[in-house]
Amino acid sequence: MERPLCSHLCSCLAVLALLSPLSLAQYDSWPHYPEYFQQPAPEYHQPQAPANVAKIQLRLAGQKRKHSEGRVEVYYDGQWGTVCDDDFSIHAAHVVCRELGYVEAKSWTASSSYGKGEGPIWLDNLHCTGNEATLAACTSNGWGVTDCKHTEDVGVVCSDKRIPGFKFDNSLINQIENLNIQVEDIRIRAILSTYRKRTPVTEGYVEVKEGKTWKQICDKHWTAKNSRVICGMFGFPGERTYNAKVYKMFASRRKQRYWPFSMDCTGTEAHISSCKLGPQVSLDPMKNVTCENGLPAVVSCVPGQVFSPDGPSRFRKAYKPEQPLVRLRGGAYIGEGRVEVLKNGEWGTVCDDKWDLVSASVVCRELGFGSAKEAVTGSRLGQGIGPIHLNEIQCTGNEKSIIDCKFNTESQGCNHEEDAGVRCNTPAMGLQKKLRLNGGRNPYEGRVEVLVERNGSLVWGMVCGQNWGIVEAMVVCRQLGLGFASNAFQETWYWHGDVNSNKVVMSGVKCSGTELSLAHCRHDGEDVACPQGGVQYGAGVACSETAPDLVLNAEMVQQTTYLEDRPMFMLQCAMEENCLSASAAQTNPTTGYRRLLRFSSQIHNNGQSDFRPKNGRHAWIWHDCHRHYHSMEVFTHYDLLNLNGTKVAEGHKASFCLEDTECEGDIQKNYECANFGDQGITMGCWDMYRHDIDCQWVDITDVPPGDYLFQVVINPNFEVAESDYSNNIMKCRSRYDGHRIWMYNCHIGGSFSEETEKKFGHFSGLLNNQLSPQ
C-alpha cells in the first residue's frame, strides 16, 4: 500500500458417537473428513482391569460447553468425589476418556475450570502411563489422601469420537442412584415406508447400540421430554405426536430386541449423556413378558424451516436467517456462528461469561435447529463489532428465546475477544455423499467430482471450471464439512482424479454462497457445455477450517473526511494510474484542479486466519510512482451515490498493497509493502490507508451540490474467502453544498435492523453500477 514518508447430580457422563455406517445418515459429527478419506475403525478390545483394583465409575460434570468435556468425578465407596490437578497429565486424561468410551483425550484443565465439585477429593498426585484399563489402576496418594481443595479440581476434554464396540461397565448400576446414561451410539430408524423415503429422517424407532447390536427402547417409561432431547440431538427443534396405532400393528409382526433400561430426561438436556438412567425393564422371554407388554419407543420430530419439505424443490435452496431477534455470523456451516442479538434496533454480541450448552441450545432451537453440539467461547468464530448486549446468560433450557433467559446487561470486563458462539445439531441430509475431492495432496483439496443421475444410473463426473470462483468453492467445502474455501481453481490438470470420472457432468455453476449443496446452485442441468474441455479445466478447491474477516472502521471514515482542491500538476501520478474521473483529461494541466473527497480507511482483520491476496508474487504489479508492488487489482470500491442508489462518482484506485500497519496487543506484524515484502493482513491487525496518499479519494469535481450516500465495499469481487461477507460494506449519509461536505450516520452494513436503516435513509445496496450522466 502507498505510504507517506513518515449440580452434581445433574452433571453428565459424556458420551456419543463414532457413527456406524447405519447411523451416519442420522447424525453428522463436526468436523469430519469425507467418506472417501475415512478408514474403517479397528475392532476395539476393552482391556480388563486387574482383580485387585477397586471398582469405580466416572462422569464428566460441571459447567460444560460440550458433552465430551467436564470436571472429572469418581464414584467410590458409595460417594461421588473429584480428582486433584496435582501431577495430573495427558496420560491420565487418556485413561479417563477411554474409560468413558472416547477414543482419546484432547487436553486437560486445572484449577476447577469447570467449577468446583463437592464431596471428597478421592485422588491426588495421580500418575498414569496412559495404558491403564481404569483410573483406579493408576498410582496415587491413596483413596481420599490429599491436601487439595476443590479449587484444584481437574477437568478433561475428550475427543468427540467414540470407541467402536465399546460397552459400558454397568456393574455398579444398582449401587449408584441417578446414574447418567451410557451408550455407544443412538439413532432414529425409520420404520414406515413414508419416512424411509424422506431426507432427513424425522420419525421412527429410537435405538441404542450395545457392543455391535442395535436395540430398541421400551416405551413403558417413555415421555415427551425424552423425545425432545432425542430430536434435539438429531437437529430438530421440537417433537410432535405420531400415529401410535400404526406402530402397534407393525411391532406385533416383528420380534424386538430391547435395551434393558429406560431414559429419564427433563427435556432441557442438549445430549442424552445428561439424562438419567431410568428404571430397569422386565425382559423375561420365558414368562412371555417383553418390555412389560409395551412397545418400542418412537419419536416424531419437527424439522426447522430450513430443512422442511417446501414446494417442488423439496428444500429451500439457500439459507437466509429470518429470525428478527437472534442471528449467527461467521460460521462455516449452517447452524454455526457467532451469536448476535438485536436490541434497540442495533445488533450486538454476547459475552461468553457463564456461556454453556443449555444457553447455546436455546439459541439453536430458536433458530430452527436442534440442541447445541458446542457452546463456543473466546471468539473462536470471529470477533463481532458494535455493542456487547448480553453477559452472564443463564437459561433453564425451557425458554423460547435467549432474551427470555436471565442475563446481565452490564458488559464491564467483556470485549469482543470473548464473543460467544454456537455449533448446533442439524439434520443429516446426506449431501456429503454426493460430492468428493480427488487427486489433492490432502483431504482438504482436490478436483471437484459430483454424483449425478444419467440415463437411470448414478455416475461420478467433473465440474466445468469455466467461471468457477471462490463463492462456488465455499459451497463445496461446506457441503463436504471441510470448513471455508481458501482457493478456487479453474484448472486442475495437476490433480489426477479417478479416470472413470473424467467426463464433465456439471457446467455453468453459479452460486450465491448460501446454498446447502452444489446441486442447489444454478447450473446447466443435463445440457452440459464446457468449451475449454474437461480434464484440464475441471473445477477444484482447497478448503480450510478458518478464514479471515475484514471490517472497515466506519467511525474513522466519518471523522477524517474532507475536501481538497488539488492542482493538476500535482496529480500526474494519479493521472497515469487513472485515479481521476474521465473529465480530468480535458482539465488544463497547469492551471486546472480537481475536487477530491478524501478520507482515511482502517481495515481490521477480525477473523481466524490471515487475509492473503489471491495472486502469488509472480502476478504482482510494480507501480513506479509508488515504488512498490501491488498484490490486488480490486480490493476496495469507493462510491458516491444519489438517494435512489445510482452511482454519481467513484474512486479509481487502480490496485492495492496490503500490509500490517498496526496490531492488537503483542501480535507480531507479518506483512509489509516495502522491499518486495510479503503482503497480507494478519489476524488481529489492520491496514491503514491514510487520507493523504495517492488515489485514496473520490473525484467529485463534476458532482453538483445535494444529499448523497457514500459507500465503501471491501473485497467486492469476493476474490478472497472470508468467514463473513455481510460486514464488508460501510455506508454513510453525506451532504455537499458545493464547498463543504458532511458525513454522518456512518456504519457497517447489517449493523442495524431494517427499520433503523430506513430511519437513516439508506437503501439496501448499490442499484446501478454505472455512472449516471451529469
Swiss-Prot record:
PTM note: The lysine tyrosylquinone cross-link (LTQ) is generated by condensation of the epsilon-amino group of a lysine with a topaquinone produced by oxidation of tyrosine. N-glycosylated. N-glycosylation on Asn-455 and Asn-644 may be essential for proper folding and secretion; may be composed of a fucosylated carbohydrates attached to a trimannose N-linked glycan core.
GO cellular component, one term: basement membrane
All copies of domain SRCR, residue ranges: 58-159, 188-302, 326-425, 435-544
Positions bound to Ca(2+): 549-550, 722, 724, 727-728
Disulfide bonds: 84-148, 97-158, 128-138, 218-291, 231-301, 265-275, 351-414, 364-424, 395-405, 464-530, 477-543, 511-521, 573-625, 579-695, 657-673, 663-685, 732-746
EC number: 1.4.3.13
InterPro entries on file: LOX-like_protein, Lysyl_oxidase, Lysyl_oxidase_CS, SRCR, SRCR-like_dom_sf
Family per record: Belongs to the lysyl oxidase family.
Subunit structure as annotated in this protein's UniProt entry: Component of some chromatin repressor complex. Interacts with SNAI1. Interacts with TAF10. Interacts with HSPA5. Interacts with EFEMP2.
Protein name stated in the entry: Lysyl oxidase homolog 2
Organism: Pongo abelii
Gene behind this protein: LOXL2
